[in-house]
Each structure stands twice: as structure tokens, then as C-alpha cells.
């Protein structure tokens, strides 16, 4: 699992059908880190700190082992002490 900050919504109207219409968000693991695209399963907004899972756990969290995701948001962090 990773802790990431949601930066913004990603709009992609032309997608493969397997992605469906699930929201996509741009997240960053830490300030200055690489941006990644995550499937949002819970309704996050920019500025939220979230818990993300990757690999096969990301596909399962998105609802199917065949879902084409390698990063899925599974929780919003209410409070934590950032180092």
C-alpha cells in the first residue's frame, strides 16, 4: 500500500471498454515524486490524502481480477502526521 495525495481529476473520454466509467485521478506519492493515475473507487477530491494499492490488489479492489488497473484508491486518510 502507498500513501498518496490526490492532485487533480483526469478526464479521458476515449477509453478501452474494460475501464468503464470509473473516475481517474492524478496522484503523487510525495512532493516532487512521479505522478500516477489511480482508479477512484470511493469518491476523492483534490487535496485528499489517500491509501492506494497496486498490482493484482489494485485489480481486485477495482472489482475484478481482470480490471486493467495497476493503482486503485481504497481509502481516504482522515488524519496522519506527515514527516
Question: Residue locations for each model-derived region?
Answer:
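Short aromatic-glycine-enriched beta-strand elements
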Residues: 15-26
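C-terminal structural segments of small proteins and small subunits
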Residues: 51-83
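Short alpha-helix capping/helix-loop boundary micro-motifs
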Residues: 34-39
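Residue-level recognition of beta-strand microenvironments
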Residues: 9, 13, 76-79
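Short, surface-exposed secondary-structure boundary micro-motifs
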Residues: 9, 30, 55-56
